[in-house]
Each structure stands twice: as C-alpha cells, then as structure tokens.
Amino acid sequence: STGAAIRLALWLALHTGRAELYDDVERLIRARIIPGQTTEADGRDDPGTAMPRLQLGAWGANQYPHAGKGANPSGTAEIAHTLSAVYQHITAREAAGLVVRMHFDYADDSIEITTSRNEEATTTVRPRVHDNVLLRLPAWAPAETVRITVDGRQISPLTVGRFACVPKELLRVGSEIVLRHALPARQTTETMPAGDTYQFAWRGDEIVGVHPNDWPMPFYPTLETREPD
C-alpha cells in the first residue's frame, strides 16, 4: 500500500541517513495520499455519487487506478498511522542543530514550519530556540532557483549533503528563515498491468493532471492533450 511504502521510505531515511528518501515520502503524500482522500468536493463535483457523512475525510481501496475513491476504517487507520509517523519526524533537534527533514506544516516548542505553493514553493521556518538550522533541499528542485533568506536578507549558506546549514550566529529566537524554489513542470507515462497507459502532468512533486481520466471521484484534474497536427 502507499502508506506502507511511505513508512518504509521514512524508516530507511531515518536509520540509514539517506536524506533523498524524504523526497519519496513527500512525493507519495502529495501525489497520492492527499488526492486520494474523500472530500466534500467529490460529492459536489459528482452529485450522483452518494456521499455518507462518515465517508468524508476517509481513505480506502479505490475502484480504478486513479479514481473511485473508497472509504473504510482499516484504510483510514493505516493512512492516519502513516501521517502521524511522518509528522513526528518532520524535524528533530540534533547535535548539529534544528534539522528540517521535510517540508510540511509543523510546530512544537523548538520550531514552527509553514509551507505554501503558488508560482513557487515556499517553506518558512521560525526557530523557537537559538540554534543552527539545517534545511533539506529537495533533489528535484533546480539548484539555480533555490533562495534562502533570513529576516528578509538573502544568504548563501554552506550545504552539507542535501542540507543547507544556517548558522545560529545569523539567527535569533523568532527569526524567519524562508526557503524558496521553483516547481518544475514535467510529464510522465505509466502503463498498468492490464495494459492501460496514463499520462501525468507534474508540478514539482505533485500531479496536476492525468489523461485519460477515470470517474467517479477522480484523484486528479483531467490533463488536456492535443491531437497531432
């Protein structure tokens, strides 16, 4: 299952130090878990679909590869378990400082993280203790688009592996560290065991379109394709 794959990538990243696996954790959550959740919009977009209230916010086996969202207690429990495990490990305070492993909203006594995605990805970190901050840089983010500011001033931090290191000498409690980078567009195709081939449009690590699309309750918007001239 997707949840099991996420947990496997998370544990391998934590216990082997392979930071690139956090990219897999984030991609599976953004490209599969979030789109696969049953929401009120599913009922509005397809009025013929019965939408019991207990089904809202749930997960379960889907009827089609990328549509027909399901909802059952075991599927919902597994995804809740997975997301809880990920949340607990978004950041950690280690000997080197505050380590931001993943780019999701988070808050505890040591740090606050907020994220947004518009024309580009923005991750804002506000340390609540005075320490170094290490920010993981996604491997898929074009290096030339990565920018980091501290309290509005752009810096060029030292990078160690996949992490940008912001020294505590540049920080104070409550400083605002902002990481920005592009969300590159690309397209991929996937052929299912039954022979059906899907075309996906990506923006960063999120799927923003699929062709052909399935109904009801699709995971993604329909990707508009052009016939050859």
Give the positions of each predicted feature.
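Aromatic (Trp/Tyr) and acidic
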Residues: 1-138, 142-145, 159
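Solvent-exposed beta-strand/loop surfaces of large extracellular or lumenal domains
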Residues: 143-167, 187-193
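Short strand-coil-strand connectors
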Residues: 107, 151, 203-204
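Glycine/proline-rich low-complexity spacer/linker segments in large multi-domain proteins
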Residues: 181-228
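Generic recognition of long tandem-repeat/solenoid scaffolds
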Residues: 121-127, 164-167, 199-202, 229
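Short, hydrophobic/aromatic-enriched beta-strand segments in well-ordered soluble domains
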Residues: 137, 174-185
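A short, sequence-level motif marking secondary-structure junctions
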Residues: 117, 159-163, 213-217
